[in-house]
């Protein structure tokens, strides 16, 4: 017998440049309806939407090169939006208010899940952040891999070939 989790409680990100990243993340979290719980010169912790995002500066002896999503550790994080319009609103905010580097603007990603729609951008340290909307039940609904009559688990994801990075 397993346990049915209730989402992700929080994610903690360690950044090289807290002077730029802490305000970036605090503003983004506030736009996403979260509230600041902890704030100091190198840390911000925002909660809401059934999760928390904690961003803190790396200790001086642990700062390193730029973030790279293919190194061991975090690849990217993704916030689930309630509508395509919310994804579009986040896009406008990160471009016009945060000046974020957009990896891809809102686009269809139905190769990942039925109706998948997403935006991908980077924080000042290069950490990749996605905001997506998947209507209905996604993979568990009609037309989904795990829904009624679905094909079941895949060995690739959305044509990305997510089999592992070792060659």
Question: Which role fits each region the language model picked out?
Answer:
Residues 59-65, 139:
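A short, acidic/glycine-rich surface segment
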Residues 5-7, 70-73, 113:
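Short glycine-enriched loop/turn motifs at secondary-structure junctions
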Residues 63-86:
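Helix-adjacent hinge/juxtasegments
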Residues 122-138:
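Short, contiguous alpha-helical
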Residues 15-20, 78-124:
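Vicinal oxygen chelate
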Residues 12-59:
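Core segments of cupin and vicinal oxygen chelate
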Residues 1-22, 77, 135-167:
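N-terminal beta-strand motif that seeds the catalytic metal site of vicinal oxygen chelate
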């Amino acid at each position: 017998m397993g346990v049915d989790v209730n989402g992700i409680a929080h994610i903690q990100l360690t950044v090289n440049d807290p002077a730029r990243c802490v305000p970036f993340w605090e503003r983004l979290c506030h736009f996403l309806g979260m509230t600041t719980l902890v704030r100091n010169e190198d840390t911000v912790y925002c909660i809401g939407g059934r999760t928390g995002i904690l961003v803190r500066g790396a200790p001086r002896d642990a700062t390193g090169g730029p973030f790279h999503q293919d190194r061991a550790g975090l690849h990217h994080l993704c916030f689930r939006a309630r509508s395509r319009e919310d994804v579009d609103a986040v896009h406008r905010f990160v471009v016009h208010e945060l000046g974020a580097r957009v990896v891809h603007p809102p686009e269809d990603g139905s190769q990942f899940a039925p109706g998948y729609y997403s935006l991908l951008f980077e924080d000042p340290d290069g950490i990749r952040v996605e905001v997506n909307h998947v209507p209905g039940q996604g993979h568990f609904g009609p037309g989904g891999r795990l829904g009624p009559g679905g094909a079941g688990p895949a060995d690739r994801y959305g044509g990305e070939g997510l089999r592992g990075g070792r060659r």
